[in-house]
Each structure stands twice: as C-alpha cells, then as structure tokens.
C-alpha cells in the first residue's frame, strides 16, 4: 500500500517533520511504500493554488497530511486522506480576520471534508469536539512518539542542582518557574530565546542561568543528560514532548496537572498547579532533598516512555490506514 506524507514547506521549525521522521521508517517496516513530499510553495494566494495542484498530482492510496497545511484537505479525496491536527492554539492566539481564516480553512472546512482525522492528544480531540460535536466519530487519537533514544547514562552529581526549561513562549509559563526558584541554590538551563522582560527578571534576582538557542538535536540531548530536573509547568500544550525526552534521559519531571501533560507524563512526574509558584518550589525542594523519591520517579518515567516508542505509534497509524481501505 502506498502512503504519501504531505508536509508543509520546510522552515526553521521542524517539530512536525522531526516527529514523522521517526514514525515513517517504522511504517515502512510494516510493509507500506511511503514517500515524504514537502510543499515547495509559500503561503500566499498564488502559492496556495500552486500547492493544491502540486499535491493533487502526488496522490497515493493513502494521503497523510502531517500537520499545519490543514487547508489542503479541502481539495483532496475525503476517503483516502487523513489529517493530523496537533493543536488549535491559533484559535486562542489569533483575532479578527486571521482568526476567521484559521477557523474556516484550518479547522472547520478540513474536518468537514475528511472522513479521517487524527489528533496527538485527547485534549486536542476534546477541543475539536467542543467546537464541532458532529466530528467526534471522525477523530482517532494517536499520540506523538519519543524522538530520541533512551539510553543509560552515568549521572555525575552536581554541586548545584541543574534545572532545565524547554521553550520560552507565553504558554510555557517560565516566569512562574523563575519566581519559584529565585531563592533556591539552583542553576537554570533555558532552551529558547528569552525576551527583555525575562532577562531583566533573571538578572534582577541574581538567578544563575545559561541560555541555549538554535541548538542541534545532539546538543539538546546532551543538555537533557546534564540536567537534574525538567520544570515544565505549561499552561497549554498540544502534547508535551519535552516530558518524554526528559524521562528518556533519566531527568526528574515536574509538569502541570492539566491535560494533556498529566496523561503524557503518566506516573513519571510530579504534577503541580502551573500557576502556584509555592507548589512548584516545594516540588523542586522535594527532588533536591529526597534521593530515593527522585530515583523512583525517574524509574516510573522510564516505564512510561515504553508507551510512546515509534514502533507503537506506527502500529496505530497502520491500523487506521487499514480501516481507511475497507
């Protein structure tokens, strides 16, 4: 069976492409003939028209839109096309005409058109169903997979506890983490570009930190291995991949007691109210002072990531493709 994966135009943000680069080889092993096809055109009126014609000429037995270019679904066969929706954050971040365009061409019309939709979490599915109750029967939840290999590492004890923050956008809620740790003997490693306000807070409160931007996958993995705690009290996630990356790296995890992060983390994290700095602080102190508890939490994380292997996720997509062909 041929499966063509339709990707957005390549850009600096490669999170979707990275995810499917782990899943697709496992789908190949299940006997599928796969191709990855990237959109060569820009997102403007002429570019969209060219994109539609381009992808219509690349149709296979199964066409899988991997995300972002949701509008393409409107112009493809509804029975042989599946769309993966990662989140609906555009509905909360956009306003006016942009929000109207996003709703109709990224949400309503693609979902109305297709028979098959996947989401990466129950939360994203729930958000869609709240907007479009009639779409529930179309949606299958297939989670993201872990995108680097777990490996046993010899952790070298640090004189100062190393706390990792991954992502600096508003939804990552890193200011609450800053407030929670400002009086603790810790050092932060922050992955992502900091704005002026964030930098000022760190410097005004004499918080020890390192800032890493534009790093490679190998560098990111090394940062995880050198960290003691991932602090991830996010306010909104489509999934929450850093949780799994930390668990695979034997890093203790603190994350939000909201969906989908609490489901993704399983039993391998301390769940906190993301807006309660004192709760976050107490959780960090617990991990700093109770080595046995920390070890138990890390072991639970290593068990949890077994549910998110590329092989497991590929099998779920295979089951969906077979259903589409009936």
Describe each region flagged by the PLM:
Residues 222-227:
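Short alpha-helical donor nucleotide-sugar binding micro-motif in glycosyltransferases
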Residues 270-277, 285-292:
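Conserved acidic donor-binding segment of nucleotide-sugar-dependent glycosyltransferases
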Residues 97-117:
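Membrane-proximal helix-turn-helix segments that form the acceptor-binding/catalytic region
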Residues 235:
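Aromatic "clamp/platform" in nucleotide-sugar-dependent glycosyltransferases that forms part
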Residues 192, 198-221:
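Nucleotide-activated donor-binding/catalytic signature segment of Leloir-type glycosyltransferases, i.e.
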Residues 156-172, 178-181:
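Conserved donor-binding/catalytic core segment of Leloir-type glycosyltransferases
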Residues 243, 251-255:
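Short hydrophobic beta-strand element within catalytic cores of glycosyltransferases
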């Amino acid at each position: 069976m041929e499966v063509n994966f339709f990707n957005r135009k390549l850009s600096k943000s490669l999170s979707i492409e990275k995810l499917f680069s782990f899943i697709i080889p496992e789908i190949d092993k299940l006997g599928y003939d796969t191709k990855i096809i990237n959109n060569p055109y820009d997102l403007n009126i002429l570019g969209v028209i060219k994109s539609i014609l381009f992808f219509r000429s690349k149709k296979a037995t199964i066409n899988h839109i991997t995300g972002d270019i949701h509008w393409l679904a409107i112009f493809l066969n509804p029975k042989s096309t599946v769309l993966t929706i990662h989140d609906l954050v555009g509905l909360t971040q956009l306003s006016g005409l942009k929000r109207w365009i996003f709703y109709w061409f990224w949400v309503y019309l693609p979902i109305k058109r297709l028979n098959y939709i996947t989401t990466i979490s129950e939360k994203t599915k729930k958000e869609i169903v709240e907007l479009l109750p009639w779409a529930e029967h179309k949606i299958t939840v297939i989670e993201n997979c872990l995108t680097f290999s777990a490996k046993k590492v010899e952790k070298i004890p640090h004189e100062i506890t190393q706390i990792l923050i991954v992502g600096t956008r508003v939804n990552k809620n890193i200011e609450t983490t800053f407030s929670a740790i400002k009086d603790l003997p810790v050092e932060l490693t922050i992955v992502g570009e900091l704005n002026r306000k964030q930098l000022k807070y760190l410097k005004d409160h004499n918080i020890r930190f390192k800032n890493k931007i534009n790093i490679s996958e190998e560098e990111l993995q090394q940062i995880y291995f050198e960290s003691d705690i991932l602090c991830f009290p996010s306010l909104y996630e489509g999934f929450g991949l850093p949780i799994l990356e930390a668990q695979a790296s034997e890093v203790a995890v603190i994350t939000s007691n909201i969906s989908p992060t609490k489901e993704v983390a399983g039993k391998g994290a301390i769940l906190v109210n993301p807006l309660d700095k004192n709760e976050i602080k107490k959780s960090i102190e617990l991990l700093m002072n109770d080595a046995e508890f920390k070890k138990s939490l890390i072991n639970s994380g290593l068990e949890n990531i077994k549910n998110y292997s590329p092989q497991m996720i590929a099998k779920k997509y295979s089951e969906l493709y077979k259903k589409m062909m009936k």
